[in-house]
Amino acid sequence: MIFGRPGSLVGAALYKEILMTDSARRINLGAIDCAPRPHLPDGFRRNSVRIGPTLGAERSGLSVYELPPGQAVGPYHYEEPEEEWLLVVSGTPTLRHPEGEERLEPWDIVFFPAGPAGAHLVRNNSDKSARVAMFSSSGATVGAVVYPDSDLVWVWTADDAVDMVVKRSSKVDDIAPWIADRNETET
């Protein structure tokens, strides 16, 4: 997908095409009301809304986060096999990534590849609210979110009932030989 401002040549063509297509679904990121998430711990108390399902998306996602000062979208993490994009709509959030931290500005776009190179945390260290949009691929039926700071892995599937969060350092020695054997015998 190509991202651009409506005033740019590429952005204008894409923007016009989407708005004039009868089957396209449109929403204004600045006009969305984000729902409070008071159950989240301090440091992650954000308002948010998942827009992808609302617009009928089945293989991609879009969530909008309103970050009060001192709050983050979530813990430092990366995903497998998902890719993500971040668009700063307003404010100046701070992005933590594998090479350090940097302050972002409105209209900044950041791409996070799947895997450790795409690890990130978005926090609002400013004294004013910030709004960001996160786009993600979501065609996989099984995946994992790895939280390096807490040594946790969230394994998700198409069935929420079998999703789980586990410690990466947990040992499952009794099953390891079976997995190795399975990988060698199946082609």
Annotate each PLM feature.
Residues 11-59, 147-149, 154-187:
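A short, N-terminal "cap"/entry segment at the start of jelly-roll beta-barrel domains
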Residues 80-83, 87-94, 98:
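Glycine- and acidic-residue-biased ligand/ion/polar-headgroup-sensing regions
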Residues 99-114:
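Short acidic-glycine-tyrosine-enriched beta hairpin
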